[in-house]
Each structure stands twice: as C-alpha cells, then as structure tokens.
Curated annotation (Swiss-Prot):
Broad enzyme group: hydrolase
NCBIfam families: rRNA maturation RNase YbeY
Details of cofactor binding: Binds 1 zinc ion.
GO molecular function: metalloendopeptidase activity; RNA endonuclease activity; zinc ion binding
Residues binding Zn(2+), per UniProt: 146, 150, 156
Protein name from the UniProt record: Endoribonuclease YbeY
C-alpha cells in the first residue's frame, strides 16, 4: 500500500548517528568530509528506495527500523575486535537483528521491525573512494548498501555469492542515481 505522507510503499525509520563529524569536526572539515556529507533526509530517501527494491526479501511489517553509525577507524576497529575477533579497522560492519528464517507471529507483524545496525568507517571509506576514483558519498552509499544486504541475510562466503551481492549493490546504487563501475 502506498503511503500518502511519504509516497513510498515501504516505510523505514532510520537512526543516523554521525559520530565522525560529532567527535572530530576539525578532522571532518580538513578531510573534505563536510563537502561529501550525506544528509539524514538523503539517507532516509536512499533506504526507502532500497527497501522497496528488496521488498520481496523483507519479512512482513508495517515499517522497518535500521541504525546507521558513521564513525572512524579507531571505533570500528574496537567493534570489529569485540564482535568478529578481527583487531583491525574495516569499512563496514552489519549487525542483523533477525534470523533469516525466523517465524513471525501476528503480534510481530503488527509492530515496526528492527532489522539491525550498520556501522561505516569514514576513514576507510575515504581511502577506498580515492582508490576507486569516485566520491566519498558514492563510497558511503556503496558500503551502506552492502551492510543493508547483510542485514537481510545476504552473505558472500564464496566468489559466486560475492558477485551476486555486488551486482545487487550496483542495482541499489542505480536506484538512487549513482552509477558505479565494479570489476567482478
């Protein structure tokens, strides 16, 4: 059903925490992050569009909740060490709140469904954007789309599943007007 207030088929409640800017405003300014910063309204729009595309893989719910935390290499390294036993920074982490085959009872279907949290390192995203020769905002969209797919049960334990996931990320970015070249 199309929501009159937003014009979207799928409703999403997004909590964006820009810890990178809040913790390091001078570094954010010096690094050019401020010029590439994605507004909360833009993130909200992107997630709406992405979830509409991925609607067939969503459990039924009146709306979906997602947390997005933008941080630095130091914090993401600590999180990576704590939860994945990898004591090094990474680009994106996703913490799914649901098991993929979780049975849904009627009470669960009536409430907003919390999908999980995505954590992105701005430092790593900046490096990767430079290596890929595209903007920081493009890299942030790419990494966040990757995290969203993980929240929905996608994984890439082998080359074939990685290629399928990367192809889906390309589709998601095209939906928000970002064209990206990926070498599979």
């Amino acid at each position: 059903m199309l929501s009159e207030e937003s014009g979207y088929l799928v409703q999403v409640e997004l909590d964006v925490q820009d810890c990178f800017f809040e913790s390091f405003p001078e570094a954010a300014q010096a690094s050019g992050y401020m010029d590439s910063q994605v507004s909360p309204a833009t993130w909200q729009d992107w997630f709406h569009r992405w979830l509409e595309i991925l609607d067939s893989s969503l459990p039924p719910a009146p709306s979906y909740e997602i947390g997005l935390r933008l941080t630095d290499d130091t914090e993401i390294q600590a999180i990576n060490a704590q939860y994945r036993q990898q004591n090094k920074p990474t680009d994106v982490l996703a913490f799914a709140a649901l098991e993929v085959d979780l049975p849904q009872n009627p009470e669960m279907v009536a409430e907003p469904l919390y999908l999980g949290d995505i954590v992105v390192s701005i430092n790593t995203a900046q490096r990767q954007a430079g290596q890929q020769e595209h903007s920081l905002s493009t890299e942030l969209a790419w990494l966040t789309a990757h995290g969203l797919l993980h929240l929905l049960g996608w994984d890439h334990p082998d080359e074939e599943s990685l290629i399928a996931m990367l192809q889906q990320q390309v589709v998601l970015l095209e939906a928000i007007g970002i064209n990206i070249n990926v070498n599979y």
